Amino acid sequence: MASSISTGVKFVPEEDNFLQRHVAFFDRNKDGIVYPSETFQGFRAIGCGYLLSAVASVFINIGLSSKTRPGKGFSIWFPIEVKNIHLAKHGSDSGVYDKDGRFVASKFEEIFTKHAHTHRDALTNEELKQLLKANKEPNDRKGWLAGYTEWKVLHYLCKDKNGLLHKDTVRAAYDGSLFEKLEKQRSSKTSKKHP
């Protein structure tokens, strides 16, 4: 796949921009641009299978590339510019990221105050379905599908043995720290299997 021209300078997401931090995990070479191959590698690193990783890399990069590259022509490499990821924010979401990609604590808390009825700090699968239904905006199939897919993959990867998706896990997904944790867990499991 394509790689960007290296300037020797690594891209560092803005500290208060949770959306940039979320996406930066997938920027495997830390140059500020995420190519489909990096999206694939990132999904594999957090424990997704080949098929899900391949499908995710195609749909995510095709869907977000042009939105994060305003004023630039079409690229067959479908790069995503991390610094502009806020321009690709989809509808039918929770509102936890504001228009600039910053974390909105009140919207995050609202997820659990409105939808976590069984356990105060966790969502059941049924409560997750209700959250997705509540977030759905009229005539926004693409945004709803994006949100649905994000939440379902998160639930699949991170639910506990009782099927609960915990508040601290969801917050870590929003700021991107969850991905680093999952990658470390996966690599330690792999190293234990192959000493």
Swiss-Prot record:
Pfam families (UniProt xref): Caleosin (PF05042)
Report the record's disulfide bonds: none
Q: Where is the EF-hand domain?
A: 14-49
**GO terms for MF:** metal ion binding; plant seed peroxygenase activity
UniProt cofactor(s): heme b; Ca(2+)
Q: Where is this motif: Proline-knot?
A: 70-79
Protein name listed in UniProt: Probable peroxygenase 4
**What species is given as this protein's source?**
Arabidopsis thaliana
